[in-house]
Amino acid sequence: MYYYLITLAVIALDQLTKWIVVQNMEIGQKIEVIPGFLYWTSYRNDGAAWSILEGHMWFFYLITVIVIGIIIYIMQKYAKGKRLFSISLAFILGGAIGNFIDRILHQEVVDFVQTVWGNYYFPIFNVADAALSVGVVLMLVYVFVDDRKTKGIK
């Protein structure tokens, strides 16, 4: 059940960082953290990643509730004893709930992490988005490693 602690930690860190941004920054304000690479940029997003489906909150409520239910079911039924699998699900669950809290309370998500690679500005994101991404990468690693074990590949 340690994976639920990971989920709670992700939610707490996500909500704390968003609260700090809302309390201390104006929308659109940018603070340079690492020159030419990392900025805190206060932004609100009423869509999904990269502002996909902006303005369709009902869709996000429905999908998020379904995803949260499925993840909790899978964690309870299949994750026990599978460390990497359960950790990946914990990150995904924490990220989903973190952004869901914003959508329920504010009908938008607070984003603030902005990275720049040369002339490319990566879309602004938050801790929940990062947790979702980490969870998906860990899940892919788990699937790849588990597949290799199943097939007996070293």
Swiss-Prot record:
Active site: D111, D129
First-listed, main subcellular location of the protein, grouped into a coarse class: membrane
Membrane-crossing residue ranges in chain numbering: 55-75, 84-104, 124-144
Subcellular location field: Cell membrane
Record carries keyword Endoplasmic reticulum: no
Keyword Protease: yes
Stored PROSITE patterns: SPASE_II
Gene Ontology terms for molecular function: aspartic-type endopeptidase activity
Membrane topology: Multi-pass membrane protein
GO cellular component: plasma membrane
Annotated pathway: Protein modification; lipoprotein biosynthesis (signal peptide cleavage)
Keywords linked to the UniProt accession: Aspartyl protease, Cell membrane, Hydrolase, Membrane, Protease, Transmembrane, Transmembrane helix
UniProt-listed Enzyme Commission number(s): 3.4.23.36
Catalysed reaction equations from the record: Release of signal peptides from bacterial membrane prolipoproteins. Hydrolyzes -Xaa-Yaa-Zaa-|-(S,diacylglyceryl)Cys-, in which Xaa is hydrophobic (preferably Leu), and Yaa (Ala or Ser) and Zaa (Gly or Ala) have small, neutral side chains
Domain of life: Bacteria
Record-level GO BP terms: proteolysis
Task performed by this protein: This protein specifically catalyzes the removal of signal peptides from prolipoproteins.
Family recorded in the similarity comment: Belongs to the peptidase A8 family.
NCBIfam families: lspA
Protein name: Lipoprotein signal peptidase
Organism: Listeria monocytogenes serotype 4a (strain HCC23)
